[in-house]
A protein has these predicted regions:
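Histidine-centered metal-chelating micro-motifs
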Residues: 64-66, 84, 101, 105-112
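Extracytoplasmic low-complexity repetitive segments enriched in small/polar residues
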Residues: 42, 47, 61, 84, ...
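Short structured motifs
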Residues: 38-42, 96, 108-109
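A short beta-loop-beta micro-motif enriched in histidine and acidic residues
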Residues: 50-52, 62-77
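Ligand-binding loop in jelly-roll beta-barrel domains
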Residues: 92, 107-130
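Glycine- and acidic-residue-biased ligand/ion/polar-headgroup-sensing regions
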Residues: 71-89, 99
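A short, N-terminal "cap"/entry segment at the start of jelly-roll beta-barrel domains
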Residues: 2-56, 102, 132-138
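Short acidic-glycine-tyrosine-enriched beta hairpin
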Residues: 59, 89-106
Length: 138
């Protein structure tokens, strides 16, 4: 196999592993019940070692996604429903459709759907390339 094909195969395998870690944090088997993460796009940036990742996140009513961090900044745009975000060291913030939130790199945070319908957000991450997009925090 040519060197280019080997590199391409390795890159594709790494992308698949990263996708699994994003889709099922803490488990390579399935997404947590009531949570759906859909990878939309991933692109290298002009800043070496950084990439932009966009993910749609859907939480069923009453479902929470526990404390976690990201290896870069997260910008949230709420598409529908109502989220409550708990960001370490700050009071909870409630977000509805059209609201935005910025979360600094490495900041521990959690989200919960506090509404009666599925809550959906567009999450844009500016992160260190090659690191897991999400790390659970106990």
């Amino acid at each position: 196999m040519s060197n280019i094909l080997v590199k391409t195969a390795r890159a594709m395998a790494m992308a698949a592993l990263i996708s699994v870690s994003v889709l099922a944090p803490g488990s390579a088997q399935a997404q947590p019940s009531g949570i759906k993460r859909t990878d939309l796009q991933r692109h290298d940036l002009s800043v070496p070692g950084r990439e932009a990742v966009q993910v749609r996140v859907d939480l069923e009513p009453g479902v929470a996604f526990g404390n976690h961090t990201h290896p870069g900044e997260e910008i949230i745009y709420v598409l529908e429903g109502t989220f409550e975000y708990q960001i370490e060291g700050k009071p909870p913030v409630t977000l509805k459709a059209g609201d935005v939130l910025f979360i600094p790199a490495g900041t521990v945070h959690a989200a919960k759907n506090v509404g009666s319908v599925t809550a959906s957000e567009l999450a844009t991450y500016i992160v260190e390339k090659g690191k897991p997009l999400l790390t659970l925090v106990k």
